[in-house]
UniProtKB/Swiss-Prot annotation:
Its main location: endoplasmic reticulum. It comes from Corylus avellana (European hazel). Keywords: Allergen, ATP-binding, Chaperone, Endoplasmic reticulum, Glycoprotein, Hydrolase, Nucleotide-binding, Signal. It catalyses: ATP + H2O = ADP + phosphate + H(+). Residues 132-287 are annotated as: Nucleotide-binding (NBD). It is found in: Endoplasmic reticulum lumen. This is Endoplasmic reticulum chaperone BiP. The keyword Methyltransferase does not apply. A motif (Prevents secretion from ER) lies at residues 665-668. One of its GO terms (molecular function) is ATP-dependent protein folding chaperone.
Length: 668
């Protein structure tokens, strides 16, 4: 374990008596004995991705549709729950019951301005429950349920977990999950809770740009390099500047916006066309969820196409009132619509450069991450800023984050072997952490961009005579007054012996772990009495009881999903058998010429009856399909056996050794 220690002491004669000791510990290796295979999951706003380190390299795992990225969408129908492509593909016809962009809600409060803005843009219903945004949706049979953002995120995590399990052929319990570097404490805690609900031990939360840097730098040997990771995804944006030196990845600075990404670009296209439709047709479609769903789908397609074309035509059949929509969109118009977003991205980059203390010519590589970095204007502005320097194209922007997470997983599990044993991550706290002191002042204990894990203690004193309770209010943010920062939580240290103001000594300790999550402790140095919290309910985190309930419900959903799949499989088995029999009795090369007329009549009658039954019983249970299959087999199988026996034990007649193989291949 490598460590660096710094200490300083000072005395402030106002409201605060100050004594500080700061240390940062960098962990090269984790205790890996208790972890199995640790997968890496990029839990994205619009798409998610999963990887695993196996046989000396990272495998990015394709889902059951053959795609290496999975839409972060969840849908509910009267019959089942859908996740991924299946959910996204039915969104236009089922908008109120299809949930997406939940990463923009996780860890936030209902009254946050971003949540209030998003409520107007999504077709599903967001409601206030205990100050948190919950999603209200009809799940089945008219039953309405509210889900926390953590529960919906857990459903996506379960999908990624199952994708990995299908590939690896074993159960997975451990994962590294990535978050935007600029996610605050509440958002990180909520992401960890989502993992618990999904039945995962989240072995580590790591920052997306840091994970992408691993993907870039894993095989890079040689001297020190400064890299800038520009991560513009579907819903969030980060810039991180790192130094890479022979496997040591040290984050120098990070900056970002947890509510800026490709979804915002799509929305600008949609707003443009909504205004155009109103002007041309006198119709406001903004409250028509189906029309908006269709428009959202085509806006995303148009945006993607404009990365390689200068003009696209957006065409939607019967968008509203039977009216077909067809309008051109040029790249120039798209860039104009989103100019303020793109400029904001590059302002964030300049702040990160300033915090890192580097000049433009000291950046050796620019690594692009996230699908939105494919936008030509984004790339052009980066090139212009760095005096014509081309961004590195060697990293897949959709997969780099999951790739790096999988490498980190292999380090934690010990399965990375020689290839990963020398990798060391030194990440940072993205936001300044502190407490409120007299006058609403934000007294900073851990400055932003401090290497984590880290610990800092300061001694405070009382403001009033005979004060017996000290309230500790914890904040994060960069402003000098707490009213302009985010309140993470509050707790009281009681039982302080009455004394004149300035006499008691209350030591407050802030500790940020390797996940970027904060623990706070306050201790009365005179009595030894202490209180501590991992900031919880004050910031809207789920209680342990809520998490336990959600874990139980997630398991129940998984059981229901299993039953739905078994029912579909049973129906498919019956249908396949029946259609196979129908084809066999009508094919001269198979059974048609070998059946007696009464045998053919019996099979055809059984097949006709089964097909009619299937039409009349679309939502039968698995047991019903199994029973029906047995009925049909009871009629058909004895006849098929008799036919084979008449023709010498093999279909098509003849006998002898040369036919033995064909017999085994043609069993019905």
């Amino acid at each position: 374990m490598a460590g660096s220690w710094r200490a300083r002491g000072s005395l402030v004669v106002l409201a605060i008596l100050l004594f500080g000791c700061l240390f940062a510990i960098s962990i090269a290796k984790e205790e890996a004995t208790k972890l199995g295979t640790v997968i890496g999951i990029d839990l994205g706003t619009t798409y998610s991705c999963v990887g695993v380190y196996k046989n000396g390299h990272v495998e990015i795992i394709a889902n059951d549709q053959g795609n290496r990225i999975t839409p972060s969408w969840v849908g509910f129908t009267d019959g089942e729950r859908l996740i991924g492509e299946a959910a996204k593909n039915q969104a236009a016809v089922n908008p109120e019951r299809t949930i997406f962009d939940v990463k923009r809600l996780i860890g936030r409060k209902f009254e946050d301005k971003e949540v209030q803005k998003d409520m107007k843009l999504v077709p599903y219903k967001i409601v206030n429950k205990d100050g948190k945004p919950y999603i209200q949706v009809k799940i089945k049979d008219g039953e309405t349920k509210v889900f926390s953002p953590e529960e919906i995120s857990a459903m996506i995590l379960i999908k990624m977990k199952e994708t990995a399990e299908a590939f690896l052929g074993k159960k997975i319990k451990d994962a590294v999950v990535t978050v935007p570097a600029y996610f605050n404490d509440a958002q990180r805690q909520a992401t960890k809770d989502a993992g618990i609900i999904a039945g995962l031990n989240v072995a580590r939360i790591i920052n997306e740009p840091t994970a992408a840097a691993i993907a870039y730098g894993l095989d890079k040997k040689g001297g020190e390099k400064n890299i800038l990771v520009f991560d513009l995804g579907g819903g969030t944006f980060d810039v991180s500047i790192l130094t890479i030196d022979n496997g040591v990845f040290e984050v120098l600075s990070t900056n970002g916006d947890t509510h800026l990404g490709g979804e915002d670009f799509d929305m600008r296209i949609m707003e443009y066309f909504i205004k155009l439709i109103k002007k041309k047709h006198g119709k406001d479609i903004s409250k028509d969820n189906r029309a908006i769903g269709k428009l959202r789908r085509e806006a995303e397609r148009a945006k993607r196409a404009l990365s390689s074309q200068h003009q696209v035509r957006v065409e939607i059949e019967s968008l509203f009132d039977g009216v077909d929509f067809s309008e051109p969109l040029t790249r120039a118009r798209f860039e104009e619509l989103n100019n303020d977003f793109v400029q904001k991205d590059h302002g964030t980059r300049e702040e990160a450069m300033e915090d890192a203390g580097l000049a433009k010519n000291q950046i050796d590589e620019i690594v692009l991450v996230g699908g939105s970095t494919r936008i030509p204007k984004v790339q052009q502005l980066l090139k212009d800023y760095f005096d014509g320097k081309e961004p590195n194209k060697g990293v897949n922007p959709d997969e780099a984050v999951a790739y790096g997470a999988a490498v980190q997983g292999s380090i934690l599990s010990g399965e990375g072997g020689e290839e990963t044993k020398d990798i060391l991550l030194l990440d940072v706290a993205p936001l300044t952490l502190g407490i409120e002191t007299v006058g609403g002042v934000m007294t900073k204990l851990i400055p932003r961009n401090t290497v984590i894990p880290t610990k800092k203690s300061q001694v405070f004193t009382t403001y009033q005579d005979q004060q017996t309770t000290v309230s500790i209010q914890v904040f994060e943010g960069e402003r000098s007054l707490t009213k302009d920062c985010r309140n993470l939580g509050k707790f009281d240290l009681t039982g302080v012996p009455p004394a004149p103001r300035g006499t008691p000594q209350i030591e407050v300790t802030f500790e940020v772990d390797a996940n970027g999550i904060l623990n706070v402790k306050a201790e009365d140095k005179g009595t030894g009495k202490s209180e501590k919290i991992t900031i919880t309910n004050d910031k809207g985190r789920l209680s342990q009881e809520e998490i336990d309930r959600m874990v139980q419900e997630a398991e129940e959903f998984a059981e229901e999903d299993k039953k739905v799949k078994e029912r579909i499989d049973a129906r498919n088995t019956l249908e396949t058998y029946v259609y196979n029999m129908k084809n066999q009795v009508n094919d001269k090369d198979k059974l048609a010429d070998k059946l007696e007329s009464d045998e053919k009549d019996k099979i055809e009658s059984a097949v006709k009856d089964a097909l009619e039954w299937l039409d009349d019983n679309q939502s039968a249970e698995k047991e019903d399909y199994d029973e029906k299959l047995k009925e049909v087999e009871a009629v058909c199988n004895p006849i098929i056996t008799a036919v084979y026996q008449r023709s010498g034990g093999a279909p098509g007649g003849g006998s002898g050794e040369e036919d033995e193989d064909s017999e085994s291949h043609d069993e019905l």
